[in-house]
């Protein structure tokens, strides 16, 4: 089969509130029993090109792949004149992105509900979807979902209050402290906190160098305040218990972006959740060294065999 990179032909769709999203679709590998569609939901500041390797690994497992860039990142439309700002008013807008993609594209690919693989922020949005719309997704695998985040150098409660204050005082469209000076292309590998794999890190940077429009410098106060508000929703009593879909959650043993202990506690409350820790891995497990990725894919394959029997 042609690689996901070679076969990539961008598609575009529009949400109900008029936002243009970039998407991609890939067929499953030939000669392998077809398992259905796998929806891949990327994390904050990511883009389709970063996941070409993951797409091919899913295709080799019998899945057709459907993925898109969230509004405000990748090749999708930006809300502000400064295209390097990650900006959102409410995470319900991300839910609209997912709804539009499911309705306009995914539901036409297969008669059965899709499977889903989601990372970090994408995992957070998917968990809210599983809670609010049971049955739309057959089963889901998560890589380090965003349920609580590190807020260094501030305590979490203070960071939440600061974000609210900045929005209240008309600074919601400004970068959070220090973000405007960030240049992801110039960040040395040794200073990154998301992967310990220099080859995959360099590949991500190469995509950004080839198309700088994919770059984000950092979030606005509106984005951060909306993220805190959404995480407060998933932390409500009974929320995890109400998610009944079969779920696999992989957490990273050396995560410095999301708080692993919060994810584990959430997973333990879900009625049909398998949790596994990838010891030593940084936040982006799927962009990690082969030895860490192998642990994820072994757990994924075992989960698929149980969650989607006969496919």
Regions picked out by a protein language model, each given a short descriptive name:
Residues 1-30:
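N-terminal cap/lid segment of alpha/beta-hydrolase-fold proteins
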Residues 35, 41-46:
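Active-site glycine-rich loops that stabilize anionic/oxyanionic intermediates
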Residues 86-106:
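Alpha/beta-hydrolase active-site loop
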Residues 245, 259-268:
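Short alpha-helix in the alpha/beta-hydrolase fold that links the catalytic acid
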Residues 274, 279-311:
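Catalytic active-site module of serine/aspartate enzymes centered on a nucleophile-bearing elbow/loop
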């Amino acid at each position: 089969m042609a690689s996901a990179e070679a076969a990539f032909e961008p598609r575009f769709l529009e949400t109900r509130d008029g936002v243009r999203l970039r998407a991609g679709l890939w067929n499953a590998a030939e000669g392998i029993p077809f398992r259905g569609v796998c929806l891949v939901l990327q994390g904050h500041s990511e883009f389709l090109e970063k996941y070409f390797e993951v797409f091919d690994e899913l295709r080799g497992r019998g899945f057709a792949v459907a993925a898109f860039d969230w509004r405000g990142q990748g090749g999708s439309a930006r809300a502000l004149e400064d295209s390097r700002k990650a900006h959102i008013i409410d995470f319900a807008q991300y839910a609209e992105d997912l709804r539009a993609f499911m309705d306009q594209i995914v539901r036409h690919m297969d008669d059965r509900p899709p499977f889903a693989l989601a990372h970090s922020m994408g995992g957070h949005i998917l968990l809210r979807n599983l809670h609010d719309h049971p049955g739309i997704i057959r089963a889901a695998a998560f890589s380090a979902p965003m349920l609580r985040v590190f807020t260094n150098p501030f305590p979490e409660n203070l960071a939440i209050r600061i974000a609210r204050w900045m929005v209240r005082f008309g600074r919601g469209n400004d970068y959070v402290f220090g973000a405007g000076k960030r240049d992801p292309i110039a960040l040395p590998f040794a200073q990154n906190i998301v992967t310990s794999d220099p080859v995959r890190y360099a590949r991500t940077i190469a995509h950004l160098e080839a198309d700088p429009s994919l770059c984000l410098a950092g979030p606005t106060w509106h984005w951060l305040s909306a993220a805190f508000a959404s995480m407060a929703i998933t932390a409500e009593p009974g929320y995890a218990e109400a998610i009944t879909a079969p779920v696999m959650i992989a957490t990273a043993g050396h995560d410095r972006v999301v708080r692993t202990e919060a994810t584990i506690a959430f997973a333990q409350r879900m009625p049909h959740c398998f949790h596994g820790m990838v010891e030593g891995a940084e936040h982006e497990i799927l962009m990690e060294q082969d030895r860490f990725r192998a642990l994820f894919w072994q757990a994924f394959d075992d989960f698929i065999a149980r969650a989607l029997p006969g496919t």
